UniProtKB/Swiss-Prot annotation:
Belongs to the eukaryotic ribosomal protein eL24 family. This is Large ribosomal subunit protein eL24. One of its GO terms (molecular function) is zinc ion binding. PROSITE patterns: RIBOSOMAL_L24E (PS01073). NCBIfam families: PRK14891.1-1. It comes from Thermococcus gammatolerans (strain DSM 15229 / JCM 11827 / EJ3). Pfam families: Ribosomal_L24e (PF01246). Binds 1 zinc ion per subunit. Keywords: Metal-binding, Ribonucleoprotein, Ribosomal protein, RNA-binding, rRNA-binding, Zinc, Zinc-finger.
């Protein structure tokens, strides 16, 4: 079975054959699950500030642990 890809922006897993793969000039490969993630990445938006991304959810858990 093929390995699932992980979106470079939101952190969501998605099936191979879907989404987009972008290769930067330095050789780094970025996977995007949707055009929404792709556009937000190229616009320079920080995924830690958007509630629906995995990066935001992980940052929120870390903040909650620090408060205790």
């Amino acid at each position: 079975m093929a390995r699932w890809n992980v979106c470079s922006y939101c952190g969501r897993e998605f099936e191979p054959g879907t989404g987009k793969m972008f290769v930067r000039n330095d050789g780094r490969v970025l996977f995007f699950c949707s055009s929404k993630c792709e556009k937000l990445y190229f616009m320079g938006r920080n995924p830690r500030k958007l509630k629906w991304t995995k990066a935001f959810q992980e940052a929120r858990l870390q903040r909650a642990k620090r408060r205790k």
